[in-house]
A protein has these predicted regions:
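Active-site Tyr-X1-5-Lys
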Residues: 1
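C-terminal substrate-binding subdomain of Rossmann-fold SDR/epimerase-dehydratase oxidoreductases
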Residues: 4-118
């Protein structure tokens, strides 16, 4: 939104989730608290995307091309693919993300445009 350059590392994959889905899950802890338990909360496994795909979705949502993007083969000292198992949160906290990355990115861009007037 601010026309600042950024770097995308090829081959890196992530699963993102929308804040509304995460907050709904965390709110369920109130009624389902189990002391000492740890939970992973993220989007659905089938939403895993290459970082470049997420970048392309964002660029599309803001109506920009990739001229400000530098593509690099690998980021040093990091895990290329970060897969998250949310099965325990699904079982204990009724975690059930509904907002796809495409919709979540669109909503986030709209929110940022409204709140930051960009």
């Amino acid at each position: 939104l601010h026309d600042k350059p950024y770097t995308v590392f090829k081959g890196h994959k992530r699963i993102i989730d929308f804040v509304e889905d995460s907050c709904r899950t965390w709110a369920n802890i109130v009624d389902n608290f189990i002391p000492g338990e740890v939970y992973n909360v993220a989007g659905k496994p089938e939403w895993e995307r290459d970082i470049k795909q997420y970048s392309d979705l964002i660029l599309k949502a803001i109506g920009k091309d990739d001229s400000l993007v530098t593509y690099e083969e690998a980021e040093p000292f990091t895990t290329k693919i970060k897969t998250i198992d949310c099965s325990k949160a699904e079982r204990d906290l009724n975690h059930n993300p509904k907002i796809t990355p495409e919709e979540g990115i669109k909503r986030t861009v709209e929110w940022m445009r409204w709140n930051y007037r960009v």
